[in-house]
């Protein structure tokens, strides 16, 4: 808490007496939903709060009315303000050098021969930007074809983890261009204290009580609710999760697994795929004689319900095969809910035995031959170790709660938006110095 207070005071002093002599255009899929969207919004809001002259520019993906309408009213208003850009003396601001941040999949960038699909121009046309930053990430052990050329065509590249820095450098990106800038999480919204006062929390608790076994009228207070939040794709390891779940638990265990998912280049018939896997796993002998532990599938919930689900879960389980960062991971941890997640790729930047349950993996395996990134490798999460980690949460709830408390502390101390704004401001001031912006170009307040 003391560290955050110092940073807050530093930002206040900076905004009052040392305003940045740059203007920033942050190009990202601000109205599409998804990981890049939430990350870019958190960065832009934090920088605006630090008095950086920043404008949000939609880029890299389509517009989702469903996503925008699902935002709380305050979040909608903040996003509109970012898209409109700062008020005041716009003519004077336009005289400042422009830093353009291209925050998306690099195939959308207007570099190295142009974008791979129609997208708004980033960098802006006509050489309007004095400096171009690329922000991106990936989830396998190497870069897709063509990425290195695109990444080397911008002035510098911000990646979220040291793991990513190594992968990008090995993939041909100039190491001098690479900077590690972690991803912020909204610790004010994803706060267990805020969720406790939310009406959605009571509704979710009642719904979970109806779903659990035994039924609500007989349900004990000790039911262990596990949550997994993911897009329905092989990379997310839902097959690993369900195999470990049904091998470890039956209907005799006081447990419930909630899958909060959405289609991603896949069928939306999630129930059929779950039923097929259950029949294959439990269809012959042994566990077949036992009723399977319950699984509930949910889709398209509000932000308030998502927060309430995090709050009600004993743990969030994410045995994925690779992550650029891990947005559900840090949201859950910010809520004080421990995470079971594969100990490879993005989550290694923030997950430890101290604040969660790192999951072992059985080496790296090649992606299927028909996959878009065939030849790449990702992790194969251990089913046996996942069973152990699930059981540990059930058998030692106090330890799980302690890990969750430390997870919340770590998110607030290291990944809160104001903490990351401080980091980004440092990079922007370095860029400002490299551009030799005269002191007189910084307007008085």
Regions found by a protein language model. Name each.
Residues 25, 209-236, 242-245, 257-259:
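Conserved donor-binding/catalytic core segment of Leloir-type glycosyltransferases
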Residues 181-196:
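Short beta-strand->alpha-helix junction loop in the catalytic core
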Residues 203-204, 417-445:
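C-terminal alpha-helical cap of glycosyltransferases
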Residues 268-304:
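Nucleotide-activated donor-binding/catalytic signature segment of Leloir-type glycosyltransferases, i.e.
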Residues 321:
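Aromatic "clamp/platform" in nucleotide-sugar-dependent glycosyltransferases that forms part
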Residues 392, 399-414, 430:
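A short, well-ordered alpha-helix in the C-terminal region of glycosyltransferases
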């Amino acid at each position: 808490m003391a560290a955050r207070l110092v940073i807050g005071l530093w930002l206040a002093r900076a905004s009052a007496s040392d305003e940045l002599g740059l203007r920033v255009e942050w190009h990202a899929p601000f109205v599409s939903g998804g990981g890049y969207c939430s990350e870019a919004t958190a960065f832009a809001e934090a920088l605006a709060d630090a008095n950086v002259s920043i404008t949000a520019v939609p880029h890299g993906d389509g517009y989702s009315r469903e996503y925008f309408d699902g935002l709380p009213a305050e979040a909608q208003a903040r996003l509109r303000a970012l898209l409109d850009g700062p008020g005041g003396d716009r003519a004077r601001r336009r005289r400042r050098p422009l830093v353009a941040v291209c925050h998306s999949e690099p195939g959308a960038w207007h570099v190295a021969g142009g974008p791979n699909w129609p997208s708004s121009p980033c960098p802006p046309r006509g050489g309007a930007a004095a400096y171009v930053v690329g922000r991106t990430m990936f989830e396998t052990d190497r870069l897709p074809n063509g990425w290195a050329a695109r990444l080397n065509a911008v002035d510098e590249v911000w990646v979220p983890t040291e793991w990513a820095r190594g992968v990008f450098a090995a993939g041909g990106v100039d190491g001098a261009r690479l900077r590690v800038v972690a991803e912020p999480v909204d610790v004010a919204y994803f706060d267990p204290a805020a969720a406790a006062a939310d009406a959605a929390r009571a509704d979710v608790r009642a719904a979970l009580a109806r779903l659990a076994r035994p039924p609500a009228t007989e349900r004990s207070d000790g039911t262990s609710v596990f949550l997994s939040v993911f897009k329905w794709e092989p990379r997310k390891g839902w097959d690993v999760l369900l195999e470990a779940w049904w091998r470890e638990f039956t209907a005799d265990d006081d447990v419930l697994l909630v899958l909060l998912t959405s289609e991603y280049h896949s069928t939306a018939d999630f129930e059929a795929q779950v039923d097929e896997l259950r029949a294959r796993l439990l269809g012959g002998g042994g566990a077949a004689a036992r009723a399977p532990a319950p699984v509930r599938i949910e889709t398209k919930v509000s932000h308030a319900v998502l927060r309430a689900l995090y709050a009600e879960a004993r743990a969030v389980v994410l045995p994925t095969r690779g992550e650029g960062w891990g947005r559900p991971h840090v949201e859950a941890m910010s809520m004080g809910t421990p995470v079971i997640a594969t100990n490879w790729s993005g989550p290694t930047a923030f997950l430890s035995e101290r604040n969660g349950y790192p999951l072992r993996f059985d080496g790296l395996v090649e992606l299927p031959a028909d996959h878009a990134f065939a030849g790449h490798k990702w992790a194969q999460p251990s089913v046996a170790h996942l069973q152990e980690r699930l059981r540990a949460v059930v058998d030692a709830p106090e330890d799980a709660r302690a890990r969750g408390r430390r997870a919340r502390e770590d998110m607030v101390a290291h990944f809160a938006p104001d903490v990351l704004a401080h980091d980004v401001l440092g990079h922007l001031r370095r860029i400002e110095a490299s551009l030799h912006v005269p002191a007189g170009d910084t307007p008085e307040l």
